[in-house]
Curated annotation (Swiss-Prot):
Its EC number is 1.15.1.1. This is Superoxide dismutase [Cu-Zn] 1. Coiled coil: none annotated. Destroys radicals which are normally produced within the cells and which are toxic to biological systems. Belongs to the Cu-Zn superoxide dismutase family. It comes from Debaryomyces hansenii (strain ATCC 36239 / CBS 767 / BCRC 21394 / JCM 1990 / NBRC 0083 / IGC 2968) (Yeast). One of its GO terms (cellular component) is mitochondrial intermembrane space.
Length: 154
């Protein structure tokens, strides 16, 4: 059993916590989150980025984690970056709270997300269906108001 956490902070009012849990390398990873400070009633892009480097804010986290060199997609797509977690949905207070299971995201094994960065974006992820090159790369999710490095937890 492996558990990890990322505490999201940034240059904005957006903050939160994302937890990850995986029983074995072949099992899905359970991802839970509570993120506040977003716009009310919005979808906000939610991704694992390649680097655990936040020295220049969330920009230093690099591109989406993509060890298999796929195009950007939705979490349910086979053709997607490992780091493509889709969107979180905010309530009337701008809080996003939820959970999901993901077979591509791993805490255990060669393509672990440990030491990488979770980013919450300022815009909605179009899930690679935006009809332009940037959509196939980033989902046109926009700026990075908050992020956190994924570290082991108890």
């Amino acid at each position: 059993m492996a558990k990890a956490v990322a505490v999201l902070r940034g240059d904005s009012k957006v903050s939160g916590v994302v937890n990850f849990e995986q029983s074995s390398e072949s099992d899905p990873t359970t991802i839970t989150w509570e993120i506040s400070g977003n716009d009310a009633n919005a979808l906000r892009g939610f991704h694992v980025h390649t680097f655990g480097d936040n020295t220049n804010g969330c920009t230093s986290a690099g591109p989406h984690f993509n060890p298999f060199t796929k195009e950007h997609g939705a979490p349910e797509d086979d053709n997607r970056h490992v780091g493509d977690l889709g969107n979180v949905t905010t309530d009337t207070s701008g809080v996003a709270k939820g959970s999901k299971q993901d077979l591509f995201v791993k805490l255990i094994g060669q393509n672990s997300i440990l030491g990488r960065t979770v980013v919450i974006h300022a815009g909605t992820d179009d899930l690679g269906k935006g009809g332009n090159a940037e959509s196939k790369k980033t989902g046109n999710a926009g700026a990075r108001p908050a992020c956190g490095v994924i570290g082991l937890s108890e």
